[in-house]
Swiss-Prot record:
The modification O-(pantetheine 4'-phosphoryl)serine is found at S37. This is Acyl carrier protein. HAMAP family: Acyl_carrier. 4'-phosphopantetheine is transferred from CoA to a specific serine of apo-ACP by AcpS. This modification is essential for activity because fatty acids are bound in thioester linkage to the sulfhydryl of the prosthetic group. The lineage of its organism: Bacteria, Pseudomonadati, Pseudomonadota, Gammaproteobacteria, Enterobacterales.
């Protein structure tokens, strides 16, 4: 599970131009990491490609924090 968490943080860091170590599970995408709506769409596409999953529109609306991303991806991977 830590491997998945690390991959998620790496993708977020790459997409948003951040330092991976500054991203915590409690980090909020918009408020803390300054992601805009386009960033979130690009993150979803990157997660879908990396983990070979399809995130529904309803799930996408609930992606507000790093932990929420992990919870949704965990549902598909495990």
């Amino acid at each position: 599970m830590q491997n998945i968490e690390k991959k998620i943080k790496k993708i977020i860091a790459q997409q948003l131009g951040l330092i991976e170590q500054k991203i915590t599970n409690e980090s909020l995408l918009v408020e803390d990491l300054n992601a805009d709506s386009l960033d979130i769409v690009e993150l979803i596409m990157a997660f879908e490609e990396e983990f070979n999953i399809e995130i529904t529109d309803e799930e996408a609306e609930n992606l507000t924090s790093v932990q929420s991303i992990f919870d949704i991806i965990k549902k598909y991977v495990f």
